[in-house]
UniProtKB/Swiss-Prot annotation:
It holds the Pfam family p450. Pathway: Secondary metabolite biosynthesis; terpenoid biosynthesis. The chain crosses the membrane at residues 7-27, 225-245. CDD domains: CYP_FUM15-like. This is Cytochrome P450 monooxygenase claQ. Its main location: membrane. Heme binds at residue 472. Belongs to the cytochrome P450 family. Keywords: Heme, Iron, Membrane, Metal-binding, Monooxygenase, Oxidoreductase, Transmembrane, Transmembrane helix. It is a multi-pass membrane protein. The keyword Hydrolase does not apply. Its cofactor is heme.
Length: 535
């Protein structure tokens, strides 16, 4: 009689893994059965699908646009290990998608783990009623009245940078090359520190900041091949995001550093509030967070949620605005005539004073056009992915032909299907923005009838701030900071590339927390420009 082998731990583990993979396969087949079969590009890799190809491209938006032209406004893209994603490039479908955010379409497991690992379980991480509660509690800090009060903070930070640059230019007025990206990082960090938390990180004064040092380390290191593979496979196995790759170790360090700072600032503010020193405004960001800790059940936030909100604000304040300011200086250095035109508008009204919030918002049309053209061409986040939480029927403004040859004006989306919006593609689409959609041309925003035929919803027909319940809460804050800083820079300095005759170098994508521009051949995410004073 053959002896019976005792079942060991590894047997149980392999059996559980087999069952898990089987359930995933059955679920995937079920989703495919409930989702309209769409056409799409051929697979390039059984292992990575087209994910690695898109991830390594300097312009995935152009790739998505070419696929939309070939396969229609919604198409299927092969992903990791035989999975697929549905990409939508149709204005009506995108409006429907965003309207159902946080309930009908939710963040993918990979996205939620990524957000939790970086900032914690706050507004970015939450869904449904929890998201609605947290957003409602924070909204007063981003009202027009609140941002109007903060405008002077943005100008103060800009002038601190000007003082530092003037010192640099004193030593070499005609040949000063400055890494502008580093300084845009510092102005953004100091602005969010003072505006949000009444705390000066002091990075513009050369003061060491732990959080700035960790952020800078993302800009100076490249992810390892192993880290890239882990990131790609995490779309199917999100638990891989807990592996100690060089990138994930940096993320852990960033979260701890931001958490320590946030904890310290909260504790200081609580003591000020208890002492009734008057230093804490209830409608400031940190004041509202303190208030939310002890609020009634409807708006109450846990301590973990409060810390997560502060982490989000530090991260968003540092990353997004600094990237946009850097792109603005790149585009204006490429086109000195547009730089001069912007300077003329600013100096014709403001030589010894600064614009008010109202003037920044409505009184400087060319500045507004430059800012929105930068945000159109260079959104900090290029694609947005969500997972269907329920079966859905998505309407289309343009009919498409399915894989079976049927013409349809709506598509079925099965529960569990990952759906993506290619933001960069939509912002640069020739169908929506005209034949010169890929060009930096701020004048388009000033033309009569501009945008009348653009069906895309969202701020000024842009998807940069997304739309619906998850539209960027800090949109007004970011726009005002962007305009204030750029107005000071352009009024006081001229910018050009430092090569012979101002030759424009190739601008590459550097993988940081968010993709950043970098000049080809530079170490890390550096953008050196020749800076001269305006005489």
């Amino acid at each position: 009689m053959t002896p019976v082998r005792e079942i060991g731990t590894w047997d149980v583990l392999f059996f559980l893994v087999f069952l898990w993979l089987l359930s995933k396969l059955v679920g995937r087949l079920g989703r495919r059965g409930r989702t309209t079969p769409l056409r799409g590009p051929a697979n390039k890799s059984l292992f990575f699908g087209l994910t690695r190809y898109l991830n390594e491209s300097d312009d995935p938006g152009a790739i998505y646009e070419s696929w939309a032209a070939e396969y229609g406004p919604a198409f299927r893209v092969p992903s990791v290990l035989g999975s697929h994603r549905i990409m939508i490039c149709d204005a009506k479908a995108i409006a429907h998608f965003y309207s159902k955010e946080t309930f009908g379409y939710v963040q993918t497991p990979m996205t939620r783990i990524s957000i939790k690992n970086i900032v914690g379980r706050g507004l970015l991480w939450s869904e449904g009623e929890s998201h609605k509660r947290q957003r409602k509690a924070l909204s007063p800090a981003f009202s027009n009245a609140a941002i109007r009060r903060l405008t002077s903070v943005f100008f103060d930070s800009s002038y601190k940078m000007k003082a530092a640059w003037d010192s640099i230019l004193e030593t070499n007025p005609d040949n000063s090359v400055i890494d502008v990206q580093k300084w845009m990082n510092h102005i953004s960090l100091d602005s969010i520190g003072i505006a949000g938390f009444s705390h000066d990180f002091g990075s513009l004064d050369g003061k060491h900041s732990d959080v700035a040092a960790v952020f800078d380390s993302f800009g100076s290191t490249k992810p390892s091949y192993f880290a890239i593979v882990v990131f790609l496979l995490a779309q199917i196995f999100p638990i891989l995001l807990n592996l100690p790759t060089n990138r994930i170790l940096l993320i852990n360090k960033l979260k701890k550093t931001m958490g320590d700072i946030a904890d310290e600032l909260l504790e200081r503010t609580r003591k000020e509030k208890e002492g009734e020193t008057g230093a804490v405004e209830e409608k400031s960001i940190i004041g509202l967070l303190i208030k939310a800790e002890s609020a009634e059940a409807e708006l109450r936030m846990s301590q973990d949620e409060v810390l997560a909100q502060m982490n989000v604000l530090i991260l968003a304040g540092y990353e997004t605005t600094s990237i946009s300011l850097t792109w603005a200086l790149i585009e204006l250095s490429k086109r000195p005539e547009k730089q001069a035109k912007l300077r003329e508008e600013l100096l014709s009204q403001f030589t010894s004073t600064d614009p008010t919030w109202e003037q920044l918002t409505n009184g400087l049309p060319y500045l507004d056009s430059v800012v929105h053209e930068v945000l159109r061409l260079h959104p900090p986040i290029g694609e947005l992915f969500r997972m269907a939480a329920e079966d859905d029927m998505m309407p289309l403004s343009t009919p498409l032909v399915t894989l079976s040859g049927q013409t349809v004006s709506s598509i079925a989306i099965g529960k569990g299907t990952v759906v993506g919006v290619p933001i960069r593609c939509m912002n640069r689409s020739e169908v929506l923005w005209g034949k010169d959609a890929k060009e930096f041309r701020p004048e388009r925003w000033l033309e009569p009838g501009f945008g009348e035929n653009n069906e895309v919803q969202g701020h000024r027909h842009l998807l940069t701030f997304v739309d619906g319940p998850r539209m960027c809460l800090g949109k007004g804050f970011a726009l005002t900071e962007f305009k204030a800083a750029l107005s000071v820079l352009i009024r006081n300095y001229t910018f050009e590339f430092p090569g012979p005759g101002g030759a424009v170098p190739k601008i590459e994508k550097h993988r940081s927390i968010l993709p950043r521009p970098k000049v080809e051949g530079q170490d890390g995410a550096k953008v050196p420009l020749r800076v001269r004073r305006v005489e």
